[in-house]
Structure formats: structure tokens, C-alpha cells
A protein has these predicted regions:
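Hydrophobic alpha-helical positions that pack around
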Residues: 244-370, 382
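Feature captures the FAD/FMN-dependent oxidoreductase FAD-binding
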Residues: 627, 632-636, 684-733, 828-840, ...
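Rossmann-like dinucleotide-binding cores of NAD(P)H-dependent redox enzymes
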Residues: 655-698, 782-828, 951-965
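Ferredoxin-type iron-sulfur electron-transfer modules in oxidoreductases and energy-metabolism complexes
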Residues: 1-7, 21-45, 62-91, 142-159, ...
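A conserved FAD-binding loop/helix module that cradles the flavin
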Residues: 781, 920-948
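Glycine-rich dinucleotide-binding loop and its adjacent helix/turn
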Residues: 612-626, 685-705, 728-788, 893-910
């Protein structure tokens, strides 16, 4: 045999073919010939390598170097550098998502290293059209053993011992199925391979057939020996041309070598295989429908019993297994059932191949032991979710399966656990979905698929799937009504119980599982006409506006920027947002996460454009609003929720008095967010506009102290409680009460209340500060401490990607010189003479997943260390201080120290006169959600009063009509988001000047033109 110094294994699966591997291979051969290397280096087209996301792929054997995403233009350089000069081309190595280092070796890449290959043991290693390469890797050895050394009963016993269960979906024990067929009387029996892989997102069987067809043929021969069959069929859909081609080649080679046909290996055993091409009907994946199709009839299921093992194809005993099941058989017989059962769980033995696809970085084929956790498959092997998005759920089992949500990432993926969670293993399609997927729309999609694929033979499936689809479609279109969810559940139960075959019996699974885990989304679609994923387009004008908690007309004000009408743009913003300047600086801009421009390049900088308008527009004069209502309203707390509610109620004619315990209004806007992010003049200007409407704001007035609770209750007709969450959570460690230990909120409040004292040095943090936490308050505290002259280290117990703080704030902190230490947890604060001198910490590693989808930090024993510091700032969370509420008030406080509110009136407490909102109800949240809570509370309060008085609902006055221009560039060219100008880090770290400088006119106009105007109605 000719020896080559290198074999270049080029992936030749359908996925890589689609990515251009055929052209890459051709040029590779040409370049090697051109340089006279064809006698030293051999190019081999293999089957699917498995890492479909990175194709075209080439492995250099025996070096083990793997090249990915090869383009035709890369090939000449690659040949010259690697095979002529001996310098591997690093830019074509694999790079893990979010990391810069490139990995040259295949076995160092987590996608490959963490798998356990049994079915896929030959993937990417052999030429699937060369039987000799298969034989060289123990191919047909299991078959030879079965035919020459074992009786049919021994073959069945070995398969039973292995614990192998059918990999086509049902999970029925393979050995038991074979035993039934073996014991069925009859001279004619059939072995059938189900290669009719019809699940959306599934490509396991196709890839096995393309990469290792002989493994399937070997398994079929062994099955034939076990049951006494002489003829077999592979039922493969015609839309798999490459798989069919390679099967035909494999069949021809096997016959030529005496491994198929008459007298196999001289044993006197006869068996041959025929390929039957199916038309691609999903129902033909059901075993009796598949057999009916082979018989030349329309593929429709038959009632059972009799079962196929007794009367299957042409009423003869038949065994049907899918591709993956049969591909296991050769190795089970060769190595023994105990070897196979050595991995997996007690009831689910061996490995399972998954087609990992959807919203995951490493799309491809994954083979892992049964019992591997869902999180390990998606994150450790799959590389997590692209684009910084959050995992939502995984659909397992295709249209017949169910979704497994984020709180079950630690779930063991085996037959029993998957069924317990409401899904099925299916053939192994694993579709990962991020937060941008709608659970209701997903259920509608799969029901639409099942409805189309229903054969129509039985009424429950034929009519039931159509009726369920109608209901789901109506919900997605905003036409859902109360009772629809319960009706879906009822119909699903009937269909599951009454349908003839597996298609109908499992069709309701996606609906039932999404209702089970995402019932709130169904309710939002029906009651609120809202799709939180911004998918169901009938429910909104544009994704950005729909995602904004207050529904700002974002496309409108961006269009007005483009038209240079900033005054009108400002008016549009003020319709829904009383704090546009504030939100242009500190909003968490969730709208941008749903901006469709982000699918092309980067989202439109909505937040920065909002700021541009508020910084540059002429502000309209605010005039007092007359009091037209007799009812008086008290608001407790002058934060964004309280002030928004006050403004809305004043505009409805109510007399409103706001009680604020701090010296100035604004809540966390004034007392928590530092001025380098939100200058006080900007905030004060927008609060003054609310005052001008006639809202009275009494500062330095704490309810329960300066004004008794009883007096508020007596003097006012309604009270809105919006005190915010101004109390830091304690760390719960020894030494927390030493001097020099601050809560994050308390430190920021103290600084903002006494800036001169801190700046003059009367108050000091010392030279070294440790900040504990990873949220926005932690970053704010750290950057404030830095500006006061300290050397600052942030200690966070997880990784950077887990930090709740805004990504841009983390980057800004790092640019300013703040050090962030990850996987660190505080053990205790150490001190001397009653003052903190250090913090003892423990290093962490990541364990399993918590309910939020983040990995839990686990302590590393013996990793303790002490960090010498002068001050410790604990910013690990906040809670409301509701101590001002008397126990006898009738206002209930829940176990999270937040107000309890009713379901039917979203902001009404357990005392009907008292309403509540903002952080005091939800816990620490965002500015824009607090504003939304204020809007909602004003509507609830006004509605409750009017209903009590027997009055009609409030009708808002007619608004000024503002013409919104519609201009969209005919050709959309990729263009990144405009960069926000900032003060230089070395300068800004020494003062509290505003860091972000705002867009200039040309920047704003250019950014505004990037808007795709998703609000357009066609």
C-alpha cells in the first residue's frame, strides 16, 4: 500500500458540500499537483465531520490539525504555507465563541473532546465510498462474529444485554423487538431500516448514511441473522441524494466482497438489501405507514395489534430499526453488550446522537452518553448561545416532542427524564431557542407541520390538529380569548388518547409543553395582546416599540431626526416618556435587543438617538394643569415610578402630593446613579416639568415619621406606594458591621448627598477599595470610588458574561483602570481596632446551572486568600425598606419584602385604597420599567376611582397630529452603529464630568438612516 506523509481529510457531507467543500477539494488537488505534492499528500473526501457550523472542514492526518471555514481563496495560501513551508495557517484554526485564542488540534476543541463516539466513530476519518477503509477500522468484524461464532439466540441475548433501545423515538428495547420477530413463525421475514428522517432540524441519520453506510449494512445483516431474514429494505427519502448514492456504492462493494447476497462469508447465510426511496411524507416515519409505502400503497398507518414483529411487511414478521440503532449493532456484537452498557444511565444505556441546531454556536452532530445534562450539550459542547442572547428552551423530539426550558438545564437527557419533562427523545433533533423565540408561535409552527403531515385516516388527528392550529393562529394574531388555553389542553388530551398512530398521539406535545412552561406567554398574547419575543407581528407595529415597556414610538422619532424635526421628535417622546433625557443616558435599552437591524450588522443606537433629541430640541413650555377632580392622591416616593404616576394623574385632573424622605426628588436617579452618567441638571430639568404641571413634591418628609401613616390614609382618597429599593442586601459574613464596610446603595447615597465632603477629603475610602457584586450598582460604586482616588477591585463570584451590569458600563470601568476578579466569593471581612483592613475570599469554580441559566459558583477548598483593603462596598442586591408600613394597614408585604398586588388590578395592594409599583413590587429593576409601572398605576387608580363613582372611563384629550415621514434607503448597506464619543479614560477617572458626550448632528443623521422602519404596513 502506498504511504503518504499526510492525508487531507476533507469533509464531504451535505452540509459542507453546501458550504463549498467540493470547490475547495478541487482547488486543493490542483494546488498539490501544481507543486508536485500529489505523490506525498493524499486528499480524501470523508463523510460528515460533525462540526457543521464550521464547514468546509479539513483535518490534516496524522498531525491532527483541523482547518475550518475554508474558502477557495484560502487554499493556495494554505498549501504554500503548511505543506510547502511547514507553517500552519492559524487564522483557519478554530476560535471559541467570545475568546481570542485559536485551537489547532481537533482533540483540544471542546466540541470534539467532550463527545463519546460509538455510532459516529468513523466520522470524518474514512472515505465512505471505500469499503476497505471501513474494514480497516474493524468494519464487518461484528457481522463475521455473528455469522461464524453465534447462534441467533446468542445474538439476541447480546443485544438484550447491551440495553440498546430504539433510537427512532419510542425507545423500545431493540433486543426484545428482535426476540419477538425471532420467535414468530414463518419462512419469510424482513429487516427494515427507517431512514425516513423527517423532523425539522434533524440530520443525524442522513449524516450517518453519508459518512458510514457500511455500519448500517453490517447492523442489518446481524439483525437478519438474529431473526432469520433473507431480505431487507432501507427506506430512505428521495431528498437525500448523497446518502442514497453512498448507500448504493456501499451495497455494490459489499456484494462484490461477498458480504451481502448469497452465502455470506461462506457461511451459507443469504441476505440482501434493497433501497426504497420514499416521497418524504412525515407519517411514513411511523413503522406501519412505512411498510404500507414499501408495499406500493399510500403510506398510512395500520391499527396494532398485530405488531410488525408478528405481521409486518406483506403481513410477514418484520423488524424495523432506525439508522442509528443499526449503526450500533456491529460494535455491540464485536465488543459485547456489557461494553455498550458501560455508559449511560440505569435504564438508558449507551450513547445518543443529537443534531444540535438552532440558536447555538456549534451547530452539528453530537454523540454523548445517555444521561448527559442538557446544559452540557448546549453550553460545554455546543458553545452556548450566539450574540450574547439568553437561552430560552430546547425542543427535543421534533414536532412530536416538547420543549425543555432554562430551569431544567441540569436535566439528564435520557428516556425517563425527558418524558418526565414533557418531551420525547425522538430521533435526536435538538433545536435550541433563544429569548427571541415565541413559545406560542413555536407551538403553532409545529402544529401546522403536523396538520400538513397528517395522513387523514383518523378523525382525531385530521380534525383535531386543524382545530388546535386555528386556535393557536388566532392567539398569535391577537384574536385569542379567555378559555382558549384550557380548550387547547382539553383537545390535546383527546387527540393523544384517540389518534391511530404516533403522529397524532404526539402532535399535541409541543402545545402541552409550552403551556406547561410558558403559560404566561399564552396569557400575555390573549389578555395583553403582547408577544414578549416580538415575533407575532399582528400584535405590534415594530419590535422595538413593542419591546419598550412604555411603548415609545421609536421609528417615529428616529424618522423625525432624519427629517431634522427635533421639536416634533421630542413631542413624540414625551407622549409616553416624561424622562427622555434621563432615558437617553441610563436606559437599559431593551428595545435594541429586538432591533431587526441587528440581524444585518448592529442594532440602531436607539438610546443615543433619544439623547440626541433631548439634548438638541427646543423644549415646549410646560403649563399648569387645572384640578378638575375632587379626589386627592398621595404618592410615597419621588423616584421614576412615583413621579410618572403623579404626572399622569395630574394630567387627568387630580391633585397630587408626593412625599419624599430624601432632600431632593428623583429616587435612585438622583441618589444612586452617579453624575458622570446622569448630570443632576438634566434630571432636575425633567422633574421641574412635572412640578410645573401642579404636582406638589414634599421632600425631607418620610411617611410614618414626619407625616403619620394614619394622616395620609385620612387626608387622601388614594395612595400610591413607590418607595423604590434603597436598602442594600447584606453579605451575611463575619465582620460586615466593621467601620469601612458599606452597602452599595448607602455609599452612593452618602456620596450624592455630600459631594463636597467626599471631594474635599473630609470623608475618605482610603487607598484600596474592594467592591463585591456584578450589577450596575456595583459598577457605579466602583467607578465613584475610583474618582475619589482609590485603587478599586471588583470581586464577582461568576464570570464576566454572567454579570448583570450593562456591558458598556463594564467596558468603561475596565478602561478607567478598575480591576475585575472573577470567580471570587467573600468569606469574611477582617479588621483591626474596629475597622476593616481586608477581606478574606475563596476562589470558585462553576458547577451546575441555576434556574436563571447561569452556572452556580462552587467553592474550591483550600483556595482562601486575603485581599488587603481599606474599604469594602457590598453591592450584591437591593431590597425595599417597607418599615414605614404599619402591620395594621391591611397592605400585605410578601416574603421578598415587596408589596403584594392583585392579579386583576396589577398595582392594587391588599388594601383597595393603596396601590404600589416600581421596585417596591418587582424588586430592583430598571428606570424604564419603573416609568411603565407609574403609567400603569395612574391608569389603575383613575379607573378604580371612576368605577367606584359609577363614571365612564377617562377619555384622553386629542393629541397634536404630527406627520411622520416615511423614507427608507432602497439599498441597505452594512454599516456599524455610530460610536458614542466619550471623554478619555485618563481624564475622566479624575472627575465626575459626564463621560458620554452625545452624538453630533452628522452622527445622529447617519445613525437615523440605519433604521429599517419595521413599522411600515405593506
Amino acid at each position: 500500500m502506498k504511504v503518504f506523509r499526510s492525508h487531507l481529510l476533507v469533509c464531504g457531507g451535505t452540509g459542507c458540500h453546501a458550504s463549498g467543500s467540493i470547490a475547495v477539494k478541487k482547488i486543493l488537488v490542483d494546488e498539490l499537483n501544481k507543486r508536485g505534492l500529489s505523490e506525498e499528500i493524499k486528499v480524501v473526501e470523508t463523510g460528515c465531520n460533525g462540526f457543521c457550523a464550521q464547514g468546509p472542514i479539513m483535518v490534516v492526518y496524522p498531525e491532527g490539525i483541523i482547518y475550518m471555514n475554508i474558502r477557495t481563496e484560502d487554499v493556495p495560501v494554505l498549501v504554500e504555507e503548511h505543506f510547502v513551508k511547514g507553517r500552519p495557517v492559524e487564522r483557519l484554526f478554530y476560535k471559541e465563541p467570545g475568546k481570542e485564542d485559536r485551537i489547532p488540534s481537533m482533540q483540544e476543541i471542546p466540541f470534539f473532546a467532550l463527545q463519546d463516539l460509538r455510532v459516529l466513530r468513523n466520522r470524518g476519518l474514512i472515505d465512505p465510498e471505500n469499503i476497505e477503509e471501513y474494514i480497516a477500522r474493524d468494519g464487518y468484524s461484528g457481522m463475521a462474529k455473528a455469522l461464524t461464532e453465534m447462534t441467533p439466540e446468542q445474538v439476541v441475548a447480546e443485544v438484550l444485554k447491551s440495553g440498546l433501545r430504539g433510537r427512532g423515538g419510542a425507545g423500545f428495547p431493540t433486543g426484545l423487538k428482535w426476540q419477538f420477530a425471532q420467535r414468530s413463525p414463518g419462512d419469510v421475514k424482513y429487516v427494515l431500516c427507517n431512514a425516513d428522517e423527517g423532523d425539522p432540524g434533524a440530520f443525524m441519520d442522513r449524516s450517518v448514511l453519508e459518512a458510514d453506510p457500511h455500519a448500517v449494512l453490517e447492523g442489518m445483516v446481524i439483525a437478519a441473522k438474529a431473526i432469520g431474514s433473507k431480505h431487507g429494505y432501507i427506506y430512505c427519502r428521495a431528498e437525500y441524494p448523497l446518502a442514497i448514492h453512498r448507500l448504493n456504492v456501499a451495497l455494490g462493494q459489499a456484494r462484490e466482497m461477498g458480504l451481502l447476497g448469497k452465502d455470506i462469508l461462506g457461511t451459507g447465510f443469504d441476505f440482501d438489501i434493497e433501497i426504497y426511496q420514499g416521497a418524504g411524507a412525515f407519517v411514513c416515519g411511523e413503522e406501519t405507514a412505512l411498510m404500507t409505502s414499501i408495499e406500493g400503497k399510500r403510506g398510512m398507518p395500520r391499527p396494532r395489534p398485530p405488531f410488525p414483529a408478528v405481521a409486518g411487511l406483506w403481513a410477514k414478521p418484520s423488524v424495523l430499526n432506525n439508522v442509528e440503532t443499526l449503526a450500533n449493532i456491529g460494535q455491540i456484537i464485536l465488543r459485547g453488550g456489557e461494553w455498550y452498557a458501560g455508559v449511560g444511565t440505569e435504564k438508558s444505556k449507551g450513547t445518543k446522537v443529537f443534531a444540535l441546531t438552532g440558536d447555538v454556536n456549534n451547530v452539528g452532530l453530537v454523540e454523548v452518553p445517555m444521561g448527559t445534562t442538557l446544559g452540557a450539550i448546549i453550553y460545554d459542547i455546543g458553545g452556548g448561545i450566539p450574540g450574547g442572547k439568553k437561552f430560552k428552551a430546547a425542543q427535543l423530539g421534533g414536532p412530536s416532542g416538547g420543549c425543555i426550558p432554562i430551569q431544567h438545564l441540569n436535566a439528564s437527557v435520557d428516556y425517563e427524564k425527558v418524558a418526565e419533562l414533557g418531551a420525547i427523545m425522538g430521533s435526536g433533533g435538538l433545536i435550541v431557542m433563544n429569548e427571541d423565540k415565541c413559545a406560542v408561535d413555536m407551538a403553532r409552527f409545529f402544529m401546522d407541520f403536523c396538520k400538513d403531515e397528517s395522513c387523514g385516516k383518523c378523525t382525531p388527528c385530521r380534525e383535531g390538529t386543524q382545530r388546535m392550529l386555528d386556535i393557536l393562529t388566532n392567539i398569535c394574531k391577537g384574536k385569542g380569548k379567555e378559555g382558549d388555553i384550557e380548550l387547547l389542553e382539553s383537545m390535546a388530551t383527546v387527540i393523544k388518547d384517540a389518534a391511530l398512530c404516533g403522529l397524532g398521539q404526539t402532535a399535541p406535545n409541543p402545545v402541552l409543553s409550552t403551556i406547561r412552561y410558558f403559560r404566561n406567554e399564552y396569557e400575555e398574547h390573549i389578555r395583553d395582546k403582547k408577544c414578549r419575543a416580538a415575533v407575532c407581528s399582528a400584535l405590534f407595529k415594530s419590535p422595538c416599540q413593542h419591546t419598550c415597556p412604555i411603548g415609545m414610538d421609536i421609528p417615529a422619532y428616529i424618522a423625525l431626526i432624519r427629517d431634522n424635526r427635533l421639536e416634533d421628535a421630542y413631542k413624540v417622546m414625551m407622549k409616553t416618556n416624561p424622562f427622555p433625557s434621563v432615558c437617553g443616558r441610563v436606559c437599559d435599552h431593551q428595545c435594541q435587543t429586538k432591533c431587526r437591524r441587528g440581524l444585518l450588522d448592529e442594532p440602531v443606537a436607539i438610546k443615543f438617538l433619544k439623547r440626541y433629541i433631548s439634548d438638541n430640541a427646543s423644549r415646549p413650555q410646560v403649563k399648569p394643569v387645572g384640578i378638575t377632580r375632587k379626589e386627592k392622591i398621595a404618592v410615597v416616593g419621588a423616584g421614576p415610578a412615583g413621579l410618572t404616576c403623579s404626572r399622569d394623574l395630574a394630567l387627568r385632573g387630580y391633585a397630587v402630593t408626593v412625599f419624599e424622605e430624601l432632600p431632593t426628588p428623583g429616587g435612585m436617579l438622583s441618589w444612586g446613579i452617579p453624575s458622570y452618567r446622569l448630570p443632576r441638571t438634566i434630571l432636575d430639568r425633567e422633574i421641574d416639568d412635572i412640578r410645573k404641571l401642579g404636582v406638589e413634591i414634599r421632600c425631607n418628609t418620610r411617611v410614618g415619621r414626619e407625616v403619620p401613616w394614619g394622616k395620609v390614609n385620612e387626608d387622601f382618597d388614594c395612595v400610591y406606594l413607590a418607595p423604590g429599593a434603597h436598602k442594600s442586601q447584606r453579605m451575611g459574613v463575619e465582620g460586615e458591621d466593621l467601620k469601612g464596610v458599606w452597602g452599595g446603595v448607602e455609599f452612593l447615597r452618602d456620596y450624592n448627598g455630600d459631594e463636597e465632603g467626599w471631594k474635599s477629603g473630609k470623608k475618605s475610602l482610603g487607598s484600596r477599595v474592594a467592591v463585591i457584586g456584578g450589577g450596575n450598582s456595583a459598577i457605579d460604586a466602583a467607578r465613584t470610588a475610583l474618582r475619589l482616588g482609590a485603587e478599586v477591585t471588583i470581586l464577582y463570584r461568576r464570570l464576566r458574561e454572567d454579570m448583570p451590569a450593562a456591558a458598556e458600563e463594564i467596558v468603561a470601568a475596565e478602561h478607567e483602570g478598575i480591576k475585575i476578579e472573577y470567580l471570587i466569593a467573600p468569606l469574611c471581612v477582617v479588621g483591626s481596632n474596629g475597622r476593616a483592613t481586608g477581606i478574606e475570599c475563596l476562589r470558585q469554580k462553576l458547577g451546575d446551572f441555576d434556574s436563571s441559566g447561569r452556572k452556580r459558583p462552587v467553592a474550591i477548598k483550600g483556595s482562601e486568600f486575603t485581599l488587603s483593603v481599606d474599604t469594602v462596598i457590598a453591592a450584591i442586591g437591593q431590597a425595599p425598606d417597607l418599615s414605614f408600613v404599619p402591620a395594621e394597614s391591611g397592605v400585605k408585604v410578601n416574603k421578598w419584602s415587596c408589596f403584594d398586588v392583585k392579579d386583576d388590578i396589577a398595582s392594587q395592594t391588599t388594601n383597595a385604597k393603596f396601590f404600589a409599583g416600581g421596585d417596591a413590587v418587582t424588586g430592583p429593576s430598571t428606570v424604564i420599567k419603573a416609568i411603565a409601572a407609574g403609567h400603569g398605576a395612574a391608569e389603575d387608580i383613575d379607573g378604580w376611582i371612576r368605577k367606584k363613582n359609577g363614571e365612564p372611563a377617562w377619555v384622553p384629550p386629542s393629541e397634536e397630529q404630527i406627520h411622520i415621514p416615511f423614507v427608507v434607503d432602497e439599498e441597505t448597506v452594512e454599516c456599524p452603529q455610530a460610536h458614542m464619543p466619550e471623554l478619555e479614560a485618563d481624564f475622566r477617572r479624575k472627575n465626575f464630568a459626564e463621560v458620554e458626550l452625545g452624538y453630533k448632528k452628522d452622527q445622529a443623521l447617519k445613525e437615523a438612516t440605519r433604521c429599517l422602519r419595521c413599522d411600515a404596513e405593506i
